[in-house]
Amino acid sequence: MKLGVVGLPNVGKSTLFNAITNAGAQAENYPFCTIEPNTGVVMVPDQRLNVLAEMYHPKKVTPTTIEFVDIAGLVKGASRGEGLGNKFLSHIREVDAIVHVVRCFEDENIIHVDGTVDPGRDIETINLELIFSDMETVQRRKDKAEKNFRGGDKKAGAEAELAGKIYAHLESGKPARTYDADDEEKEIMNGWFLLTTKPVIYAANIAEDDIGKDESEIPFLKTVRSIAEGERAEMITISAAIEEDIAQMSPEEKAEFLEEMGIGQSGLDRLITACYRLLGLISFLTVGEDECRAWTIQNGTKAPQAAGKIHTDFEKGFIRAEVVPYETLVEQGSMAACREKGLIRSEGKDYVMKDGDVTLFRFNV
């Protein structure tokens, strides 16, 4: 899964990306310092792997990962190619979801591109550029569908009609993801690859002094929360500067720091968890002396397709999946104990995987 980190210049986007990946993306106090997208892979925090590693003492522990892309900043007019707009829009097309960093702090030493801090205006600036780009796409689709319909393609009529509805929806300033499409319409829209259908998490970048405060005590957050709820997006609060510091700490130092701050989980861990939830992802686990590993799948994935994540042969020759819930395995202490008590289930090709399933796939090729 690939997530694009976006935001106006000087909102803390590259600072946050540095913290996410430790990739050292240049974070300077001027616009467009991130010209080509920096890509980094971050481990998905999963305490279950640590527990399993204590049980199995494997040669290797492999968490699942999410790929983050730091996408160049943009200005008004990006959809017309101004600033770094064309590159911004092409890079957005390649990601599965968008992490939109929004500045929610005052700092006279960090110049805002528009002179003042206004989260609502900043969100609108980026969202409108994405909407304008989608309007062009939808208009082209509508013109093509109408032409095909006149040429005798009856199915094209439905696409042209839908394109008209979506264009009007976008024109009213709403992202395509807030349009209540039925299954047939969703199938048509999937072929359009619209930017505003992508899931969004708003990362409200707050001042270090605001960490630990109630959301109601930070005036900027009310605006961001309202926008997120209105367009079916998620919002988390984060201090990019603090997260960058935490990223340099050892696990022990990090735990001590979070405890001192009165925070149960780092902002990055909350961001990654929110991304998982937003994209409808879960993890299943495999264990053994060689490796304990987490694997990412879409919620609703059936056993053969999950097996295919490990190796295509596992899916082709799938026989069955031997499954025990993580909690049961830990409670019993070993797979042998689970087997002895009849706690390992044998599941066929129609079994829908659950988060935390510890699984052994049987296959024959």
List each language-model region with its residue ranges.
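Short, intrinsically disordered, mixed-charge
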Residues: N22, E54, S90, L128, ...
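C-terminal-of-GTPase-core extension/linker across diverse P-loop GTPases
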Residues: K2-V6, F17, Q139, K144-V352, ...
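Conserved Switch II/interswitch segment of TRAFAC-class P-loop GTPases
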Residues: G40-P45, A72-E82, R93-A156, H169-D182, ...
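Amphipathic alpha-helical transducer elements in NTP-driven molecular machines
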Residues: F32, D46-L49, T62-F68, E82-D96, ...
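Short, flexible surface segments
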Residues: E94, K354-D355
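Conserved G1/Walker A P-loop phosphate-binding module
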Residues: M1-I111, A145
